[in-house]
Amino acid sequence: MFMSSDANACEIDIKPRSRVVTHGIEATTSRGMLRAVGMGDADWEKPQIGIASSWNNITPCNLSLDRLAQGAREGVHAAGGYPLQFCTISVSDGISMGHEGMHFSLVSREVITDSVETVLMAEALDGVVLLAGCDKSLPGMLMAAARLDVSAVFLYAGSIAPGYVTLKCGESKEVTIIDSFEAVGAYKAGLIDQDDLGRIERAICPGEGACGGMYTANTMASVAEALGMSLLGSASPPSADRRRDVYAHKSGEAVVELLKRGITARDILTKEAFENAIAVVMALGGSTNAVLHLLAIAHEAHVPLTIDDFNKIGNRVPHIADLKPFGRYVMNDVDRVGGIPVVINALMREGFIHGDVITVSGRTMAEEISDINPGLPDGKVIHSFSSPLHPTGGIKVLKGTLAPDGAVAKTAGFDTVVFQGPAMVFDRERAAMDALSAGNIKKGSVIVIRYEGPKGGPGMREMLAITAAIKGSGLGKDVLLLTDGRFSGGTTGLCIGHIAPEAVDLGPIAFVQDGDIIRVDIEKSSIDVLVDEKQLRARHLTPPPPRYTSGVLSKYSKLVKSASLGAIT
């Protein structure tokens, strides 16, 4: 439900940018161009609204976006605006995982932000509906809204339905894309045969939509709701569900209403809104990538969010959602029990949510929750706070002699509070994968993968291929993996990423050697290499040469900042 424009609406210019292309003698040529795409004399007083979509048919994540863009266009028209649609890129992490393509994943976030900025500024658009489906496209769109500070509404493509597989042994089970990565590890370890591997491959993606667990895409869709940048309830309906078309139409209406009220993205993206988003991520046990992305969105919004804010909130907010990759359920199940508003409502009742923040509806979060009346947690998919899965949030920031500027762990996956063991050091992911395939990874080891950070990778690759292979080979609870790279939202096991400073910046991880004892204490939020600092720094260091000397990743490596700052450029 939208708040109607107030009495002072007549004082607000609903065309704060586009008058330069629709009014006056100087706009003759631009009006002529706009007439060719369908505008006419009756349209010059209407606000021009960008419909920015990351649609493509490379990956199922984005297939619904063309349909949803049509709904958003219709909503803009209905509210008195004029929609102008354009597309930007999107990278499929599922397809790029485990090979050179993964270097290009995180940089795609920046390319998306830059490209949306470029079009909105070049074409003088007044507002924008942002549509995205795959992992990096969601934060990329939100970063663009924050940077430009225009009236903006975000809409998610929706998630995929789970697949179902029957194995040769007769076992039937629900599967997601993560099962395929783990099946590869199981196959290499001789635990399953090629026939079962093929059955899993054919079952994991039964249709359109983003990966179905509480992986990065669904985490960031939930974040968008919690920030107030999406209409409440819009994150959880599946991609193919026609409720999405209704949300698309309403999103188009909403952006015009925001213009009429003079509300822009930074009015919504306040420090309190980011605290709400962190609380939701902690309660859901969401992806560690949310740390990077929230820091980056906050940077664009000029909000002083730091990596330390995550522990401040996570130490108070329990983990209550039993969702994959560690739990039993997927986003479709969250939708079945009331969606993300159920989580926000539960958090608000416990005092973990700022209810007075404004949302894209023009109303406060508390008003929206009251109007929706989402009900209470069902006790299975979403637990109550009296019976949480874990007493603190699902993500923790660690600091210590190995990561003075911080590291990030998804603590929902840790069965042990303390892990201590000898380091097995690998320069880049491929070397670690080769060692695992050769059977050289031993129980009790701490696998250290370095030179995979934002600058050193470059691109801070996700380590899903190696972590899934570790789990598939039966070592998931017996080894700890540390990296200055990052992890997929679907990663399971004992994994700590985002170690900063990264190796290429001569962080302590660059000086670690095989056999060094590393100790992680989740309860104390500490991560240490048990070697005297002077001894560590005295070691000879020969970093590998830059992997890319031209192209987008060469540019990126020269601009990108630390993971502890959100890997911003």
Curated annotation (Swiss-Prot):
Keywords: 2Fe-2S, Amino-acid biosynthesis, Branched-chain amino acid biosynthesis, Iron, Iron-sulfur, Lyase, Magnesium, Metal-binding. Its EC number is 4.2.1.9. It comes from the Bacteria. Signal peptide: none annotated. Binds 1 [2Fe-2S] cluster per subunit. This cluster acts as a Lewis acid cofactor. Pathway: Amino-acid biosynthesis; L-isoleucine biosynthesis; L-isoleucine from 2-oxobutanoate: step 3/4; Amino-acid biosynthesis; L-valine biosynthesis; L-valine from pyruvate: step 3/4. [2Fe-2S] cluster binds at C61, C134, C211. Belongs to the IlvD/Edd family. NCBIfam families: ilvD, PRK00911.1. This is Dihydroxy-acid dehydratase. The lineage of its organism: Bacteria, Bacillati, Actinomycetota, Actinomycetes, Micrococcales.
